[in-house]
Amino acid sequence: MKMLLIHSDYLEFEAKEKTKIAEETENLKGKLDECLACFIAVEREDENNPEGTAIGAVEEIEKVANQLKVNNIVVYPYAHLSSDLSSPETAVKVLKDIESILKERGYNVLRAPFGWYKAFKISCKGHPLSELSRKIVAKEEKKEEGEESKFYLLNPETEEIIELNENNINIIKDEELLALAKHELGIREHKEHDEPPHVKFIKEKDICSYEEASDPGHFRWYPKGKLMRDLLADYVYNLVVNMGAMPVETPIMYDLGNPAIREHADKFGERQYRFRQGNKELMLRFAACFGQFMMKKDMYLLPRYLPLKLYELSTYSFRYEQRGELVGLKRLRCFTMPDMHTVCLNLEQAMEEFEKQFWECLKTGDDLNLSYSVIFRFTKDFFDEHRDWFFKIAKEYKNKYGKDVILEILPKRKHYWVGKVDIAVIDSLGRPIENPTVQIDVESAKRFDIKVHTNEGEIYPIILHCSPTGSIERVLCGLLEKAAIEAEKGNAPMLPVWLSPIQVRVIPVAERHYDYALKVAEKLRENNIRADFDDREESVSKKIRNAGKEWVPYVVVIGDEEMESDKLTVTIREKSTLKKPYKEKMTLDELIERIKKETANYPYRPLPLPIRCSLQPKFH
């Protein structure tokens, strides 16, 4: 903010004509004698903390007013003091806040309207302190000191909860849950600073890599990686549609001049992409909340529609992570977020849906063969009131998965939710990759004016936020980290067969086997199995090694014996170790049947690469 302060005999103004950004007001003229005239330009950087900027401006105005022994203040918007102005909405808010705070402190304040062409007269007193300029930096608001969250391990059977701390944390016997608890309590291990293995894998396996011509944390996806990402998106789509969700699509950018959009965005702090276009300040979304909430606001919602679920694959979502925090697919600035929001009539319905969606989130771990660790987070009031409900869920979870859960209790609500569950995969370095989540939002319906029309009148509903898998990139991250853990145990690392870009590689021993090998690969493709045929001029042993490096689940070697017997020699990666491949003899039909059984109920897409390996291009 820039300010010009003039100690004046008087200031008189009259608003003559509106501009496009004029505020609506009836105060079109005014005069104040013996005043401090404050000409103010609100700047773009003030948008990060409008309240703090207003407080900083008031403190500076007050200092000068006290020096001059002045009680009359004119707040006069004056854009000509800066070439880097804030949005009109922010400027009006800051100017009104300055007026309001000054009045609260006992000053007589006249504020000229924003966005009008105005005529004004001023008489400067002409003494050494009569003309002063100031640059205002936002005053940091003092954070409320309060009780911190507490973390507990609980025994669902006895309903005993044990508060966790650095001294007793090793009572947790499950290594993955222990790693999650250490992370939550801020207990860091030395190996956490190492680079996770998936960072190497994503490049080695031709999945994706950083795009140097873009902002850090943005990836380019190669055909194999794009295929994997699309398959995961198809998987989530099928899951949520079966849950009763209606897919929608909304914009990726939003106008921060909308008060509800700004307030919701500000809940997430500074880690956002914001930019200006003309007089508008816009932001790139970090989730699908904004568009879905605006859509729900315009719907005429009736109780019989509820619970109402809208789903969007938020491609792309943006989060401006600090550069030093960017780590492969775990922390990036552009990601793909499956995002479902459920409108619930009341808290009772919301809790029922929360429970159902929690189990659907856990199902994704079963389907993806990922080991999940669970932490529930509740405000103290909510937990105290619904303790029995929570322990019922925890007990059912323990009975099904044999695992305990961690519980975080917040002394009071500081977010839009009163309860949530976060589900994490633990990477090979013992760090959590938080993926699925369900949250009970008690705030956003009112903020966005989302209403349900009942016989008794309009009510604000409860909204659940749910991402059944977490971001697609983090799912891949978790799968690759799991593969690294398997490799540490001596097992052959691999991805699920349905998600593997190449499911079968056919390798001919000699040129005379090429035609037969090609027919095998073609028949596999005809049966919706992603197969290719290695016709490169390399030794058979090197071709087999290459297939191993690419984690191909099934490798078929075709020689004279295979052609004569119609029995294929198949290396099955799932049963192999790093030192010893596992091989079986089977017919082509048996191989097809085996793969179809393994991939049943999972989405399929064809391999977007030539069937001949010699024609498949290299991307780096």
Swiss-Prot record:
Cell compartments where the protein resides: Cytoplasm
Known catalytic reactions: tRNA(Thr) + L-threonine + ATP = L-threonyl-tRNA(Thr) + AMP + diphosphate + H(+)
Top EC group: ligase
Keyword Nucleus found: no
GO CC terms: cytoplasm
Residues covered by region (Catalytic): 197-496
Keyword Ligase: yes
GO molecular function annotations of the record: aminoacyl-tRNA deacylase activity; ATP binding; threonine-tRNA ligase activity; tRNA binding; zinc ion binding
Binding site for Zn(2+): C289, H341, H465
Pfam families: HGTP_anticodon, tRNA-synt_2b, tRNA-Thr_ED
Major subcellular location class: cytoplasm
Regulation: Not inhibited by 1 uM borrelidin (BN); probably does not bind BN.
Domain of life: Archaea
EC number: 6.1.1.3
Cofactor: Zn(2+)
Domain notes: The N-terminal domain (about residues 1-140) is an archaea-specific tRNA-editing domain that has a highly similar structure to Dtd (D-aminoacyl-tRNA deacylase). Editing of incorrectly charged L-seryl-tRNA(Thr) by this domain is tRNA catalyzed.
Quaternary state and interactors: Homodimer.
NCBIfam families listed in its UniProt record: PRK03991.1, thrS
Functional note: Catalyzes the attachment of threonine to tRNA(Thr) in a two-step reaction: L-threonine is first activated by ATP to form Thr-AMP and then transferred to the acceptor end of tRNA(Thr). Also activates L-serine, but does not detectably transfer it to tRNA(Thr). Edits incorrectly charged L-seryl-tRNA(Thr) via its editing domain. Has no activity on correctly acylated L-seryl-tRNA(Ser) or L-threonyl-tRNA(Thr).
Protein's name according to its UniProt entry: Threonine--tRNA ligase
Lineage: Archaea, Methanobacteriati, Methanobacteriota, Methanomada group, Methanococci
